Amino acid sequence: MKTIKKEFVKKTSPYEEKVVKIKRITKVVKGGRRFRFSALVVVGNKKDQIGFATAKAQEIVDAIKKAVEKAKKQLIRIPIVGTTIPHDTIGHFGASKFLLRPASKGTGIVAGGAAARTVLELVGISDVLTKTFGSRTSINVIRAVMDGLKNLRTKEEVAKLRGLTLAKNEQ
């Protein structure tokens, strides 16, 4: 009799995922309370792509899996110059406002909250100055950071939009 050996190779994803928040949510029904879990997950490749999502499920593990899959479908590309961002930007979402400023090499991520720091680490930005204004709820801060990152443009993109050409020393 021939034995068949199967090798299970775990698929390695180029994306790193971090769970920002897990909370138990409750639905009150006629017979009592129904409990589920909600997970907020950020996914990035530490080069230039980032995405986030929330998902709910009966078990924590299932909620995280669902959120990771959703986040991978919503990835966006961010322009990065070296280890920082090309210019100042402000992101808005709801009552949250998030200011991002480029910083010199070696500064690190100066961010007040864990949610914003997670997003910036996973997108691949290692030198940036930030300030959060207004609401500091983790989901609102993440959405404000993402809005700010979406507004970033490189020199080349701005020049093209304005119909200009860059000098050789500016490139």
Curated annotation (Swiss-Prot):
Residues 15-78 form the S5 DRBM domain. The keyword Transmembrane helix does not apply. Keywords: Ribonucleoprotein, Ribosomal protein, RNA-binding, rRNA-binding. Coiled coil: none annotated. With S4 and S12 plays an important role in translational accuracy. NCBIfam families: rpsE_bact. The N-terminal domain interacts with the head of the 30S subunit; the C-terminal domain interacts with the body and contacts protein S4. The interaction surface between S4 and S5 is involved in control of translational fidelity. Part of the 30S ribosomal subunit. Contacts proteins S4 and S8. This is Small ribosomal subunit protein uS5. It comes from Phytoplasma australiense. The gene is rpsE.
